[in-house]
Amino acid sequence: RRTFAYKLRNKAMNMFSSFENFNLIREKAEASRKAENRPHEVLYFHKVDDPYSHLTVHYIDKFKEAYDVQFKPILVGEENPAALHEPTLYTDYCLEDVKRIASYYDVDFPGKSYPEKKLVDKANSILTAVNPDEFGSVAKTVSHALWSGDLAKLEELEVSCLLYTSPSPRDEL
């Protein structure tokens, strides 16, 4: 049935999703950022046991060199399996896909299978302690050790990160 509420809902949804409205919101946000003299921010969501994160982390430093941005890494955990249509197929595909494409990005991907939970937890604990400015370089090393199954290297990194990383802005709070 086509009712007045139907027409009103369609009008509201069209206004909400319009490209012009999107641009207005973007322009207001950009004007606000400039008025507050804030740099552009890039939020990078990193999942240590995600094969695509292994590829992406190799380009963080290049990205930061190319653009004047404030880089904010955020570690994420497991996704809700209910959100994935076929969770097993998805994880299998991700792993196989990265094995196939890593060489095209000049990235060494040593993973043959997903890392053990113990290694994933160790990698997360290391990256949690890292200053955002050092995240790219440390995360590359951590990721390679994780996907290689190298517990000794992760333990070595954990000790060195805790001893030698500069204080995080979170520590100043």
What name fits each language-model region?
Residues V48, H54-L146:
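Structural alpha/beta surface segment adjacent to cysteine/selenocysteine redox centers
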Residues E36-L55:
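Local sequence-structure signature of Cys/Sec-based thiol-disulfide redox active-site neighborhoods
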Residues Y164-L173:
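Single conserved hydrophobic/aromatic residue that forms the stacking wall/gate
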Residues R1-K28:
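N-terminal leader/targeting and pre-domain segments
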Residues T3-K7, K11, D97, S137, ...:
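Exposed alpha-helical structural elements
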Residues E156-L163:
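An amphipathic alpha-helical core segment
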Residues A29-K34:
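Glycine-/acidic-rich phosphate or pyrophosphate-binding loops and their flanking alpha/beta elements
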Residues W147-A152:
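Acyltransferase
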